[in-house]
Curated annotation (Swiss-Prot):
Keywords: 4Fe-4S, Cell membrane, Iron, Iron-sulfur, Membrane, Metal-binding, S-adenosyl-L-methionine, Transmembrane, Transmembrane helix
Predominant location category: membrane
Stored PROSITE patterns: RADICAL_SAM
GO molecular function per UniProt: 4 iron, 4 sulfur cluster binding; catalytic activity; metal ion binding
Keyword Metal-binding recorded: yes
Protein name: Uncharacterized protein Mb2609c
Membrane topology: Multi-pass membrane protein
Domain Radical SAM core: start-end pairs: 58-307
Record-linked PANTHER family: SLR0285 PROTEIN
Localization per record: Cell membrane
Residue intervals passing through the bilayer: 140-160, 243-263
Cofactor note: Binds 1 [4Fe-4S] cluster. The cluster is coordinated with 3 cysteines and an exchangeable S-adenosyl-L-methionine.
Gene Ontology CC: one annotated term: plasma membrane
Length: 340
């Protein structure tokens, strides 16, 4: 059996029903480690709801989200969702990367919610918190059920991912697009292979994601690209952005969204610890940029806008397609609205 060697444990030890009160609150069934996913523990839970209503939705292109996972093995050091793991009594650093909560019944619960007479078939965004095509999806395959439920109910959907596992579902996504409006977006903001390995260690390579863009287009779907977050002094040079947007255009993307890094909550400390270790010469500059809060100052955003706008025009990446941005206030503070 494929999972015959799996162990039900947390940190290599049998589960103690009282050891993880945060998980118990959200319906823990069991915790599993498998040799195919070395270093990752999956915490299987039974969720009571699937649809999440977004606060302040008037400022976003969607009002509802579905997230089948909490935590993410992509391990992006800048991930804004890291603080959400603290509610589960995990830390927002390595625990966020290795302790992944799986809502095993999410598709069934979603189908029930979509049958309610009160459901108005508003757009549902997938991938706004943690990546729906992270490694866990290879084991649990939650997305086919989620996509199928939304399409069958007549509900428009959007998908945002760094995960090349989306290729598996391209026939299903293309079929769904015949029934309801569907938008697909790939996140790709780091073109340098060495920096990618350091700052997004669990994600597919930039080249693999470029190939994913091409595959999405070959399936007859538009593909937007989220060039975000742009990292000050690391990925914001004209040379890097020119090369990256050129590659994205060559891959067949229909448009891009560009905005800079924001650092809030415990994500700020996690990222700054990495920066001090990997690029100590940049620490003072980042402290200055973020001294007033989690967002880059207007002067920086204007600089980035002026740098990016000509490149978007050069590579004809100003498509009208609008993907669902991350479920965060950063979506309310873009580089420039015209880049969306």
């Amino acid at each position: 059996m494929r999972w015959a060697r799996q162990a039900v444990a947390v940190n290599g030890m049998p589960v103690d029903d009282g050891a993880l009160p945060g998980l118990q609150r959200i319906g823990l069934v069991r915790s599993v480690r498998a040799p195919q996913f070395d270093g990752i523990t999956f915490h299987e839970v039974l969720c009571k709801s699937a649809l999440n209503k977004v606060p302040n939705a008037a400022a976003l292109p969607f009002r509802y989200t579905v997230n089948g996972y909490r935590g993410c093995s992509h391990a992006c050091r800048y991930c804004f969702a890291r603080p959400t793991h603290e509610y589960l009594d995990f830390n927002p650093g390595t625990d966020f990367d290795t302790q992944v909560v799986v809502k095993t019944n999410v598709a069934a619960v979603l189908r029930h919610e979509l049958r309610r007479p009160s459901w108005r078939r508003e757009t549902v965004a997938l991938g706004t918190n943690t990546d729906p095509y992270q490694r866990a999806e290879g084991r649990y395959a939650l997305m086919p059920g989620i996509i199928g439920a939304l399409a069958a109910s007549g509900t428009p959907l959007s998908i945002l991912t760094k995960g090349t596992l989306l290729r598996r579902d391209l026939p299903l996504i293309a079929e769904a697009a015949q029934q309801v409006p569907v938008s697909v977006a790939v996140s790709l903001a780091v073109g340098d292979p060495e920096l990618h390995r350091d700052v997004e260690s669990g994600t597919p390579t930039p080249q693999a994601r470029l190939a994913l863009i091409t595959a999405i287009r070959a399936a007859g779907l538009d593909c937007h690209v989220m060039v975000a977050p742009v990292l000050p002094q690391l990925t914001d040079s004209g040379e890097h952005l020119d090369q990256l947007l050129g590659q994205i255009a060559a891959a067949g993307a229909t448009g891009v969204t560009v905005f800079g890094l924001h650092l809030r909550g415990s994500t700020r400390g996690w990222f700054m610890c990495w920066l001090a270790r990997a690029h100590p010469e940049l620490v003072s500059r980042y402290r200055e940029l973020y001294r007033r809060g989690p967002y880059l100052p207007p002067s920086y955003r204007e600089m980035l806008r002026e740098r990016v706008a000509p490149l978007i025009a050069k590579y004809r990446l100003a498509g009208d397609h609008r993907p669902a941005p991350p479920e965060t206030e950063a979506a309310l503070v873009p580089v420039q609205a015209t880049l969306f």
